[in-house]
Amino acid sequence: MRTMKNLTLLALLLLTVAVVAQTPLPQGVPGPNIPRGKAPEQGYVPDGWPAHPGSLMKYSVEIRFGEEPESMPEGMKFGRVSAVTTDAQGNVYVFKRDAKTDQLVVFDSKGKYLRSWGKGMFTRPHGLRTDRDQNVWALDDAGHQVFKFTREGKLLQTWGVKDKPGNDAKTFNRPTDIAWDSQGNAYISDGYGNRRVVKLDKAGTFVATWGTEGDGPGQFRLPHSIAVDANDRVYVSDRENNRIQIFDTGGNLLTTWTHLGCTQGMYISPKNEMWIVTHRNNTENVTYDTLAGQVMKIDVESGKILGSMESPGHMLTATPAGIVYVASLTGNVFKWQPDPWWPARAHEAIARGVPPPK
């Protein structure tokens, strides 16, 4: 009898998982001219979404860096983790806020500690990116600086003046993230203080800036993350305004997405695949990093949500193989691995008496 009940439960679980994973949920993709008040008529809620917009992605967590496995040197801990990036060899770079030990820590893809640097160098780590030449860029928002390193940790360039916020061509005020266009120009979301985007050429020479504080077109309340797609469109996560604004490389506003909630971090791959980590709205985001957060895969042309999964997160990156790394202020980096056998794992849930992995 017990065996029959288990088999019945297994069948129901598998059916439920299959339906959720394969059936897209209703959603609308608003354009820039759809008023927020009209949004429900268009098929979506501006500051909310179903449990899994688009479709539930078949991913599972393979590793939680900093916990599974625990391979860091004795005495080293993450504290809050602000950002993560990878290099061409698949190594994982973690930017952590605990300043008692090195704040930039490198692992291999299986979580083995490789090296680290930057003890006491950063006031408040924020963004971390790898450029096409495999240099590592770190943004210290409270120190008002942007650093360029080799993968081994050699400092190559420093932009901004330490502990001196400003809004001219050579200073920042709490910069948050960096991205590059096809010509190698850098775009910095600057940030908590200036509420602007700064464009620099590949040598670090000031080119242009745009944006002021506010909620109008082209204004920002907090440009928290930035990304550039294959067509050189510049995406700015205007987090406190619950929107993503998209510009050309000259700072001209092209369109605005208001259906993705309070976006924390964005990443657009060389293959033009877009990933975000987001919350429904600022009320939810005040906790900074909760299980209410979602990682979403987005169509860069339309803004359509292609799939999602629940995950706490602050910043994220992805590999060409589709592995997603999410940096969490809870003190982890989650490695989300595509899992073709995900629905079949329901039997493990029955054996352990817990729901199947999400």
Q: Which residues make up each language-model segment?
A:
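Bacterial N-terminal signal peptides that target proteins for export
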Residues: 1-9
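Bacterial N-terminal signal peptides
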Residues: 8-18
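Eukaryotic scaffold repeat domains enriched in small/polar residues
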Residues: 22-358
